[in-house]
Regions:
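Extracellular lectin-like interaction modules
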Residues: 1-363
Length: 363
């Protein structure tokens, strides 16, 4: 136990290199510096002010690691526990240049309470734990690979890539990456949420409203890249109004979309539907690029829905719109019977076969 009041604490050499030391408890509002590796039962910085500078590359404990004040990384850093929590209560930043961070808590948790990357972004961050939770913001051009479950209570903005192997609970309004977002496990959404990326967004499993929430609105925007839905959407608890914007949208054979009374809008230049899309509100499918042509029921067009895909659009929508008022590309329709109220909006609409409508139609 070390208490220096307002003074600094400095570990110049390796701690526990021959045999791990016991619990390290530190209290000091000055700068605590680890210049080399640490092997101990636990490491706890009790102070909420001051800075802990981890410059030695590695801290390994059998018990918890808790950093109550701001943490800076002066080297590529590995923090390891034996199935115990790693907690950052204060901010976490790189020092000098972007530093990589590897966290291994086993069956313990990784908890970020303070902002990450607000001064100088981290590099590649890998977190292995039962659950990784951010309660504040993640910013900067870092990559985050989370092995285990994730809870996002704080916003994520400007990071490069984000990957979660387990389940994801989204309780924040913004997740923005300049690169990819990949969610292998089930995703549950608690609040109105906007997911945006400069590259592909991929959902490997289900997406639902969280059990404690009521129909949050959801926006998914992968720019000119691909949004892929490989699991059922809304099968357990439907989302609120949902918009998907991408260069290409793909729903796999298990990627059904159940909207009930919530509206669904898909804006894309290419689409592949492999499972049922159902709802009682409105469905809009519009081109992302104004000049994109639309082909329906075997007709040619870049944004194309063949007969099988049209059959996946279940009867029951209050209105279905294909195209947009801003679009200039031609809509070409093969032989098909549309049963819901349908609006086709584009520069030109033509039929290569027998269009039949059992609901209202406007062209």
């Amino acid at each position: 136990t070390i208490n220096t009041g307002t003074g600094a604490i400095t570990f110049t050499g390796a701690v526990g290199a021959t045999k791990a030391v016991g619990a390290i408890s530190l209290t000091g509002t000055g700068t605590t510096t680890f210049s080399s590796s640490v092997d101990a039962t636990s490491v706890v910085q009790n102070s909420s002010t001051g800075t802990t500078a981890i410059n030695g590359g590695r801290i390994t404990t059998s018990g918890v690691q808790t950093f109550g004040n701001a943490v800076t990384l002066g080297a590529t850093t590995n923090l390891n526990t034996t199935n115990n929590n790693i907690t950052f209560t204060g901010s976490l930043n790189s020092s000098g240049s972007s530093r990589n961070l590897v966290l291994n808590a086993g069956s313990g948790a990784v908890l970020y309470t303070g902002a990450v990357g607000s001064s100088l972004a981290l590099g590649a961050v890998s977190s292995t734990a039962a659950t990784t939770t951010n309660s504040s913001t993640w910013v900067g051009s870092s990559t985050y690979d989370i092995y285990g479950n994730a809870v996002f209570d704080g916003s994520i903005s400007g990071v490069t890539n984000l990957y979660v192997s387990g389940t994801t609970t989204i309780n924040t309004g913004t997740i923005n990456t300049t690169g990819t977002q990949s969610y292998d496990g089930a995703v549950s959404i608690k609040v109105n949420t906007a997911l945006s990326a400069g590259s592909n967004i991929t959902f490997g499993s289900t997406i639902n409203t969280h059990s404690s929430a009521t129909t949050p609105t959801v926006s998914i925007d992968s720019g000119s890249a691909i949004t892929t839905l490989n699991g059922a959407v809304g099968a357990v608890k439907v989302l609120g109004a949902t918009s998907i914007s991408a260069g290409s949208v793909v729903t796999g054979s298990s990627g059904s979309i159940k909207m009930d009374g919530s509206a669904l809008s898909i804006t894309t230049d290419a689409i592949s539907i492999g499972a049922t899309v159902s709802g009682t509100s409105t469905l809009t499918i519009a081109p992302k690029t104004a000049s994109t042509t639309i082909g329906l029921a075997g007709a040619s067009g870049t944004l194309n829905l063949d007969t099988t895909e049209l059959n996946y659009l279940s009867d029951g929508f209050s209105a279905m719109t294909i195209g947009s008022a801003a679009a200039t590309g031609k809509i070409t329709v093969g032989s098909y019977t549309f049963k819901d109220t349908l609006t086709l909006i584009n520069g030109t609409a033509t039929s290569n076969g027998g269009m039949q409508f059992t609901g209202a139609v406007s062209v």
